[in-house]
A protein has these predicted regions:
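Acidic carboxylate-rich catalytic motifs and surrounding loops in phosphoryl-/glycosyl-chemistry enzymes
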Residues: 18-28, 264-273
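Charged, often glycine-rich, active-site loop that binds/positions anionic groups
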Residues: 26-48
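Short, conserved beta-strand segments within well-ordered enzyme catalytic domains
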Residues: 21, 32, 99
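A general structural signal for well-ordered alpha-helical segments in protein cores
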Residues: 4, 40, 72-75
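N-terminal low-complexity, Ser/Thr- and acidic-residue-enriched intrinsically disordered segments
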Residues: 1-26
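A general "terminal functional-core" signal
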Residues: 50-317
């Protein structure tokens, strides 16, 4: 999509400190942590029924499969970088890292929906839990993951995948009357009315983060930083301003920072009447992320942990 190309161009031009890399493609084995083997095979072999393809929203092609694998793989790479689980002797937790696309939260274990084929947040959460366990063994607590989904649409696929999984907490603020019209119950869902503006939105977010803090202690946050709550979005039906969305991101990044919880984020939805507005919302998120990445690099937190990692600086992915 054009917005992704525009975002890459602006990040390269205006935020040269941000290091980017090609998104790796998630393997069948990695995808199978969140999706059934039968569904993966049907997608990759082009054998999904016509009704299933209509639910996804675009036609099958080999390029679609590759793009979907890489969308999931990019969130995996961001989560690895945030936690410091990437390969190499220079692996150090970045604290904050990103996927310039992703946020495919309508995909469930058995089907895609709403332009989402594979659920990148779910794949990344499960894979990071597995890799964390292999690295640290029984001497460290299992990795708990919070998915903070602030796309305007409820993350129904994510909620369904983790319905019986107490190690992953799903939090979603979304439009009550927006897609999907049949919501899935997550761990914490907050419905917002059409036309919701900055002040009530931020009050709801404060309440949600307070409740998350009360009920769960994550070792990783996966944040879906949707641009579609913006007042100029064609599909969002909410009315947040640029400043309101900056304040939203600030709250999430600060919440994670105060608890020294690494955070990986994906850009998720954004369908502005003016595409430049969508990209500006996303750029604002990147600028804030860079500021928090700097805090992580200046912090002595990771140097005080008993981790078999050799610290060297990394930039957001």
């Amino acid at each position: 999509m054009a917005k992704y190309a525009l975002l890459r161009e602006r990040v390269a031009l205006e935020l040269p400190q941000v290091q980017t890399q090609e998104a790796p493609a998630a393997s069948d084995g990695e995808l199978a942590l969140a999706h059934s083997p039968a569904y993966i095979h049907a997608v990759t072999s082009g054998q999904l029924p016509a009704a299933a393809m209509r639910e996804i929203g675009f036609p099958w092609s080999a390029q679609m499969v590759e793009r979907s694998r890489r969308s999931a793989g990019a969130t995996v790479a961001a989560a690895r970088a945030a936690l410091g689980l990437q390969a190499g002797a220079d692996a150090r937790p970045a604290g904050v890292a990103a996927n310039m696309a992703g946020g495919t939260h309508h995909a469930s274990a058995e089907q895609g929906s709403g332009f989402c084929v594979f659920n990148d947040a779910a794949v990344a959460a499960r894979l990071m839990q597995a890799e964390w366990g292999r690295l640290h063994g029984p001497q460290r607590a299992a990795l708990q993951v919070a998915v903070i989904d602030l796309d305007v649409h409820q993350g129904n696929g994510t909620a369904s995948i983790f319905r019986q999984d107490a190690s992953v907490f799903t939090l979603s603020l979304h439009g009550k009357h927006n897609f999907p019209f049949r919501k899935e119950a997550g761990d914490l869902d907050m419905d917002l009315p059409d036309g919701c503006t900055d002040t009530p939105y931020l009050q709801a977010l404060d309440e949600a983060l307070f409740e998350l803090d009360r009920r769960f202690a994550p070792g990783l946050v996966i944040y879906l930083a949707g641009a579609d709550p913006f007042e100029g979005d064609r599909l969002g039906r909410l009315a947040l301003s640029f400043e309101g969305l900056k304040a939203r991101d600030q709250r999430v990044f600060e919440w994670a920072w105060q608890r020294r919880v690494p955070l990986a984020f994906a850009m998720a939805g954004g369908y502005g009447v003016n595409i430049d507005d969508t990209v500006q919302v996303q750029m604002n998120t990147y600028e804030l992320a860079l500021a928090y990445w700097r805090r992580w690099q200046q912090s002595q937190h990771w140097q005080n942990q008993e981790m078999s990692l050799n610290p060297k600086p990394q930039h957001p992915t």
